[in-house]
Amino acid sequence: MRQNQLIEKITNEQLRTDIPDFRAGDTVRVHARVVEGTRERIQLFEGVVIKRHGSGISETYTVRKISNGVGVERTFPLHTPRVAAIDVVRQGRVRRAKLYYLRNLHGKAARIPERRRG
């Protein structure tokens, strides 16, 4: 077995299959596992996906939310075991793959219309 095939086999075993289909503009709730000392707990992070980056085992996504009037962005690896679950709260209708322009918008201007299902 060549090295490329071996790496591909190992990464395919580590890919998660329980990830819902979501894209930039969707509002998601990420259940992140946080270790504090000897205890482990679930911390929720709900916000708008502003980008997805990469492919395969190294794919990441960035979620943005406003907390106490301050914009907070957090980047998660898609296939990490540190994320217990990802819930899609609502699907947004956007025309871009990267929503960096949301960083400069405030209030109602930063809202994303909901995508129609059909």
UniProtKB/Swiss-Prot annotation:
UniProt keyword Ribosomal protein, yes or no: yes
GO cellular component: cytosolic large ribosomal subunit
Keyword Ribosomal protein assigned: yes
Biological processes, Gene Ontology terms: translation
Keywords: Ribonucleoprotein, Ribosomal protein
Single GO MF descriptor: structural constituent of ribosome
InterPro entries: Ribosomal_bL19, Ribosomal_bL19_CS, Ribosomal_bL19_sf, Translation_prot_SH3-like_sf
Family membership: Belongs to the bacterial ribosomal protein bL19 family.
Function in brief: This protein is located at the 30S-50S ribosomal subunit interface and may play a role in the structure and function of the aminoacyl-tRNA binding site.
Protein name: Large ribosomal subunit protein bL19
